[in-house]
């Protein structure tokens, strides 16, 4: 019964604060930043957004800005991929990465695969 009351109080507090109480746990923030750094440090690909190519450094800066503006809604690395790093919120077009050999990969797939790899690394 105490657990139900605590859960209810936490939910009520989050609503009362307009979502301000919601924030990604530190380990999820770390995973999100690792995904962004994974893109940022790649020299062998380009980031494609709304038909234009960007360097990976530019992509990382853009994704951090988008995360900052939507941050309170993003609680996990998977949500980051799905809601921020997958598609344009303006046009709805999916983001892509172009590898050095010309292969295009949806950014959602690219980051989901990297997240899976990260999850299987020793801590």
Residue ranges with predicted function:
Residues 24-69:
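N-terminal secretory signal peptides
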Residues 19-23:
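Sec/Tat signal peptide C-region and signal peptidase I cleavage site
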Residues 50-123:
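Compact alpha-helical subdomains of small soluble proteins
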Residues 3-17:
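N-terminal export leaders
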Residues 2-3, 28:
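Short alpha-helical segments used as structural interaction elements across diverse proteins
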Residues 1, 45, 95-97:
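Generic preference for hydrophobic/aromatic residues in regular secondary structure cores
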């Amino acid at each position: 019964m105490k657990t139900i009351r605590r859960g209810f109080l936490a939910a009520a507090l989050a609503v009362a604060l307009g979502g301000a109480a919601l924030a990604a746990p530190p380990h999820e923030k770390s995973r999100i930043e690792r995904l962004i750094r994974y893109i940022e440090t790649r020299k062998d690909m380009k980031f494609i957004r709304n038909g234009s190519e960007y360097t990976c450094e530019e992509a990382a800066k853009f994704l951090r800005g988008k995360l900052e503006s939507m941050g309170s809604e993003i609680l996990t690395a998977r949500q980051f991929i799905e809601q921020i790093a997958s598609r344009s919120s303006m046009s709805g077009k999916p983001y892509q990465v172009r590898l050095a050999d010309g292969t295009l990969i949806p950014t959602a797939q690219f980051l989901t695969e990297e997240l899976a790899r990260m999850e299987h690394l020793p801590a």
